[in-house]
């Protein structure tokens, strides 16, 4: 009740500030790869905007920062699709136009012992750019290989690209909804192509 709330405030009890989610209906947003995505509002929890210490939560600060920085595209993993309606509702509450959303499939690694794939992690080997460079792979070959993970140029079957060619050929619409598997043999082949060209 309002009286109980006031009593807690008068007592100095810590509290959070939440955004009240709609109790009925659905929230729909458009994703470049997945099309129209609709989540029932009953699946959305009232999200915390300000923590007990008065600091904003990541999701709250992120939406504000993206708006103030004029971010045009939010490109992130598919695991964030279910939280996107909360962001959309925040944009609506502020009266702001949401950015373009693109949710990418994860890059997978293959377990050599079982042949099964799972989200790429350190157990699959080197996972950072620097680790791969230290292993002897040319930086340009790594960039070229990673660019082709989950993306296919629409106008060519070319596999070896200069940076300028990648920039020219890239389009979000060429991204795949399906997870790509990181393949060290393919990276080795790509590196060989770069070494031959030196």
Residue positions per predicted region:
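Active-site cores that bind ATP or allylic diphosphates and position pyrophosphate for catalysis
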Residues: 1-103, 108-120, 128, 153
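Catalytic adenosine-cofactor/nucleotide-binding cores of aminoacyl-tRNA synthetases and other
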Residues: 82, 94-198
